[in-house]
Amino acid sequence: MTLDDLGHFNFFGLKEFIDYYSLVEEGEKKEESLRKIFDRVKEIGGYISLNHPFHNSRKMPLGLMYDIELKYLDFLEVINSPTSNGRNPYYDKKALEALDILWCNGYKIFAVSGSDNHGMIIGDPLNYVKLDEYSTKNILETFKKGRCYVSRIGELELEYKNNGRVVYPGEEVEGKVEIKVRGKENLIWKVIKNNKVIETVIGNEIITEQVVNEKEYLRIEATDIEHEIFAVINPIYNSIEKIEPQIKRWFEIKDSIWRE
């Protein structure tokens, strides 16, 4: 969904058509129009994803230029196909910076990707979802819980344990966590906790043991030497709902990131 190409969104899980024209009034601010649309999406049980939030090249100024309330977001697109094959990895990097800011402020918003095909390769990148059963309902519910990861290098081998218990990305943990991730390519694997890189490993796998305390989250990503992103595994976390958000709207994130 887009009003005028100054912000693109995906809505997941809609069971009925939304008549956008009935919600939007002529001359009103776009933020108000979006608020009413988002309220309707949530009312009927849908989820909201913000797509390519910083993709603002001269040819494709498609990043979000409206100051929406962050509380509406369920997902943030961190890899999008216009950045494939070495094209503009800068924009994906900025999206990941936004993801970390959101989590540091207690927002449980998960990373997703989109091939967003407009003449490019479909399926680059892909979302991989851990399912207990194959059904539309289960896919949506599991997606919403963040039990998924984004990859450009195919399926990853994941093994997460919290105090001996098997867990998955997107789950609540406490204390010691053992993590093993293996991919098909040699990359730079980074362990990120509360917006800080705490461990880096080069190769086709990472094996690490960490502690996740209250109000902390931990995630893993993989890049090449040019900092192009090839995999993003959603966070595990401990009581981040106890964090009092210091930011409430999109421009607070956008302005801080563009200043850097």
Where is each model-derived feature located?
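Short, solvent-exposed loop/turn segments at secondary-structure junctions
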Residues: 56-59, 85, 200
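Short, glycine/charged-enriched secondary-structure capping and boundary segments
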Residues: 62-65, 90, 126-127
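A short helix-to-beta-strand connector/capping loop
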Residues: 71-72, 107
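A metal-dependent hydrolase metal-coordination microenvironment
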Residues: 1-51, 71, 78-99, 112-120, ...
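C-terminal functional module detector
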Residues: 41, 45, 105-111, 115-260
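Short, glycine/serine-rich, charged loops/turns that create anion-binding
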Residues: 16, 55, 196
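Alpha-helical scaffolding within the catalytic cores
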Residues: 54-66, 97
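A general structural signal for stabilizing positions within well-ordered secondary structure
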Residues: 67-70, 103
